[in-house]
Amino acid sequence: MQTRFGFSYYPGCSVEGMNKAYDKSTQLVCRALGIDLAELDDWNCCGASAYMSIDEMKAHLLSARNLALAEKEKKDLVVVCPACLTTLTKTNHYLAEGSKFKKTIGAALKAADLQYFGSIKVRHLLDVIVNDVGEQEVRSKIKMKLSGLKVAPYYGCQLTRPFGEVDDKEFPVILDKLLEWIGAEPVDFPLKAKCCGGLLMMTNEDVGLGLTKNLLACAQQNGAECIITICPLCHMNVETYQGDVNKMFGTDFKIPTLYFTQLMGLAFGFSRKELGIDEEMIPSRPLLEKHLEVMG
């Protein structure tokens, strides 16, 4: 496939560590769509989550280093983790607005033989596929029908907040659009931009499991056969903790969970093995075999 778009690629710690299937499917889908992702050399943690709460300035330093590395490559930065998107974008905004950290960050970058002029835009892959690649190109790659597959499009709480640059903060539709383009049927999912519980699973598990239970119940009540995610932490909570939710609340959830790039990859004709789908905890094979059909 001829390259049509080129970006620096920031996998982030979650994808690099526990979510290899997200990276596998991302690489395959991007190759099919002519998106060249050049992994950022020597990238480091973005400073998201707990680090930002403990020492905000040092967290921004981590993000600023990644932005400076991307600027050296003269390409905008694509991420697949909304937490990384939020943290990197927040640092970008702070530096552009001349925040109290700007001088300290500039000095730290200089000590590492780096500098940052603010030319890099950080984008989520979903945004790139929908707004740069577009519907026609996506539809042209489809080889398998997802006949009647009802999906709950789950955005999580960080893709659109706090900046609202990707879509509406409360009622995003960008993932719904993409899922329709590849032949799936997004169901009404009122909690699609609500928190999954995040790191509360480590600090206040009862509250975290309650939030996850609400998401699973909402998806099930609205007829979803699987949940489609764009965030590695959301994916882990929604899939991995279903057993814990069932024990705590007496429920019986067994809802398969897939990354949006995995579902795209299936529609594009890639195998489950290539996309890392058979590595999941809640098997989706029976569901996918029921709905997948070769395009006539």
Q: Which positions does each model-derived feature cover?
A:
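Iron-sulfur cluster-binding electron-transfer modules in prokaryotic oxidoreductases
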Residues: 1-296
